[in-house]
Amino acid sequence: MPLTTTETRSRTEDATDVPWNVVVHNDPVNLMSYVTRVFQKVFGYSQERAETHMREVHELGRSIVWTGLRERAEAYVQQLHGYLLLATVEKS
């Protein structure tokens, strides 16, 4: 049985409303102090929180630095790319 317009719209809205993660990946180029400053500037994180995420990136190879709506996550990734950080968006 085909989906009604309401059912289709509801499924589409559900798909975009799922939380999305902004993931920063380790790279061999950027200094740890630089990555910390970028997290503070882009996300408004405290020194301590920014350093925690930076350490995750450095030690684990990645860190989920933000979770929320997809559109905002994609905007954050673009900002991070502007600072030459490796960042991606993934479903939470």
Regions found by a protein language model. Name each.
Residues M1-S92:
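Terminal domain-initiation and capping elements
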